[in-house]
């Protein structure tokens, strides 16, 4: 029963999050830009070195998957992208424009919807 409740809650959160992302063009652009520039290292699934490194660093205290994080700030995302961190390279404005970086920032710092955010049918 608990497992079914957990699965139902996860499905609700994902569908509500998708609905809100579709309503926000900046978040959609951020998703597409993240998939193009960042997902090779920071995507979901095995074989993504950034995700693996962050999971090892945080040891379960925070998710290794950036898209699942709730603690990211716009300033932190911009800093990491423009200056690089550890083995992550920095990205120039000619690679990721300021507008694209703003979209990535909006995508990664979006918050999951609450019940009041989701429109009832």
Residue ranges and their predicted role:
Residues 88-90:
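Methionine-biased hydrophobic packing positions in alpha-helices, especially
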Residues 31, 43-79:
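Gly/Gly-Pro-rich "capping" loops immediately C-terminal to redox-active cysteine motifs
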Residues 30, 34-45, 104:
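The canonical Cys-X-X-Cys-His
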């Amino acid at each position: 029963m608990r497992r079914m409740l957990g699965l139902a809650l996860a499905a609700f959160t994902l569908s509500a999050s998708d609905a809100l992302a579709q309503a926000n063009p900046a978040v959609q652009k951020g998703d597409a830009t993240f998939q193009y520039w960042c997902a090779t290292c920071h995507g979901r699934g095995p074989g993504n070195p950034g995700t693996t490194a962050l999971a090892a660093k945080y040891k379960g205290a925070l998710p290794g998957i950036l898209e699942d994080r709730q603690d990211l700030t716009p300033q932190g995302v911009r800093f990491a992208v423009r200056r690089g961190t550890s083995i992550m390279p920095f990205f120039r404005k000619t690679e990721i424009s300021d507008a694209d970086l703003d979209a990535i920032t909006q995508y990664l710092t979006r918050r999951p919807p609450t019940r009041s955010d989701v429109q009832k049918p």
